[in-house]
Amino acid sequence: MKITEQSIKEMSVRNYHKRVVITGVGPVTPVGIGKDAYWESLINGKSSMRQISFPNKEMSQYRCQIGAPIDGFDLSHFVEKSKLSKHLGRTSQFAVAATWLALKDAGIEFNMNDFEKEEFHHKHTGVYHPKNLDPYQIGVILGVGVEAMDLMEHFHERFLSRGLRGISPFALPNIYLSSITSHVAQYFSIRGTSYAVSTACASGTHAMINSFLQIQGGGEDLMVTGGADACITPYVFGGFDVLRAMSVRNNDPNKASRPFDQERDGFVMGEGSGVLVFEELDHARKRGAHIYGEVVGWGMTADAYHLTDPDPNGKSLGKAVKDSLEMAGIHLEEIDYINPHGTSTLLNDRVETRMLKDVFGKQAYHIPISSTKSITGHLMGAAGGVEAISVLLAIEKGISHPTINYEFPDPECDLDYVPNQARRKEVRFGLSISAGFGGVN
């Protein structure tokens, strides 16, 4: 458009920043599905890591033989079966279930599509459709590391043995990264913005930042956001194994994830989804929604250092933290709780501790810091969403969950990691930190 003094004034009025709150949470994790079960496991430090195996694969070739899978998961326990559901990979199944939980928690009501009625079918193509809400004012942005690797590996093996006859026409469409948001949008008749974000283990957090911006700029009233991942497959698990990024404490799985502990030797891979409902403040108030908290700041940076290792000085990660605090307009001493990336790898925990001391100075020693990954394992692209839920529940309950398995202090990791026991403390402002391969923060 042509820029004039009048147009500048008009656009300034039109583009005022809207406030963004969280009105629903849906955790699907190895330690609990739904916010109540998840929270109970968090505050009690209850993990569910165990030895794993892959069909027709010799496990002795894997250095790490433990993980945190979600046992007994069945999508039909959450939503009605449909033609769509039978083609979904495990990642999308987690995302659909978590979305259902989050929307239900947010008080969003849905009607189920009656596919027997032709006129109804033409109006509503999804399995469910929202009542009393404009589907074009609801969007979905989700983070994912590697979508539907279970399907990809399955069809790759069939291709090697049977050629093209072994490949389903549904194989390729369901392994696009964007298919995860397409599946969620189709299931719940969400017709606003829909796309996936893939920035390794920061994917869920980056998706939430993009959803925040979408609402803040007036794009939608409500966003389904967070992340999902299901990486416990022979190839993906093997890829991390050859990187020597995972713990080899195979005989003691529940002690293997030990962020900031001197005996840590790598992360434990988990799987699942953490979905949140972001909503414009006035929209949430008008419908009487429960508000968990408000998103007040964010920061994103790149290390520009290494494909897998974090920059040892942590400066770029620290810049992202500083940017989020500056945007929020809050002082260092106002942060009451930090949920760190806290992976249980030798380098990450050391760099993250150094960064927090650099950003917060002496105040860093007075802030409770607890790693959700000590309990859930590392949920990869889902981690940011699940850990944001941890922060919101800490704010709501006034309790910081523990970092479990913290037994041997590391002189280079000397902050308050809320060791082994939950702690009651009022939380007004919480900070969630994510980082990923490629130096994405």
What residue ranges belong to the model's regions?
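Conserved beta-ketoacyl condensing-enzyme motif
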Residues: I22, K46-T199, A228-G239, L332-N348
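Flexible, low-complexity linker/loop segments at domain and module junctions
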Residues: K2-I22, K123-P135, A328-E334, Y365, ...
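Condensing-enzyme catalytic core mediating Claisen C-C bond formation in acyl metabolism
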Residues: R19-T23, R50, N251-A328, D336-Y337
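Acyl-CoA/ACP chain-elongation machinery
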Residues: S53, G219-D265, W298-P312, G342-D349, ...
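ACP-dependent fatty acid/polyketide chain-elongation machinery
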Residues: K2-L84, A106, D282-Y292, I389-I404
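A glycine- and small-aliphatic-rich helix-loop capping segment at beta-alpha/alpha-beta transitions
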Residues: K35-E40, D150-L164, Q214-G217, F237-N250, ...
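Active-site-proximal alpha-helical scaffold in enzymes
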Residues: A95-I108, L177-I180, A185-F188, S194-D229, ...
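Glycine-/small-residue-rich "gating" segment that lines the acyl/pantetheine channel
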Residues: S161-S168, I209, L213, A230-K286, ...
